[in-house]
Amino acid sequence: MNYMQIIIFLTYILLSSSFVVLSKKVCKKYTQKYLTNKFVPVLEEKTLIVQHNNKKFNKIQHNIFAQIGSNPKFVNNEDYHWFDGDGMIHGIYFNNSKIIYQNKWIQTKRLQLEEKWKRKLYLYFGELKGINGLMQIMKYSLMELFGFIPPYGKGTANTALLYWNKRLFALHEGDMPYELNIDEYFNITTKQRLHYPSLYS
């Protein structure tokens, strides 16, 4: 990307941001219910270990209970919708002496890029409303055009988990699956985004 493209992009961001601020003064204020009460995002990745001597857990030792859901890392408070959050896996591992809990963000291409810029970059479902929605679409289209956002890897991997052929995947309808790895110490990591040369999502 050359300097002229960067100048054009930054100028557009400045002008569109000013317009959006003005337009929000006369537009409807949208709900924030998906960021409150039981929907409050988890802000940190944690590992918690609880020792136990309960023999009831022997029946399920070396098993894992896991779920995945929407948990935004960078969020627009006003326009956020729970479809938009980054995928986060919550897992509990059992053995005969301890229970281990761990939560991890799925390291999607989308999240990695936003972590690099330390801000929200992608277009959110909840933003597609009114004048502000049109401006966000225009801004997002220019970011794609100038190469700030790649044409692939836009999914959040926040919809479901699939265990298939001894492999664990995080799924999202709008993107390829992300393969996860759980090692012998119950450390959850994102292994890779599946890629097939003749298949696009």
Regions found by a protein language model. Give the residues of each.
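Cleavable N-terminal signal peptides of Sec/SRP-targeted secreted and luminal proteins
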Residues: 4-16
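Beta-propeller domains
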Residues: 19-201
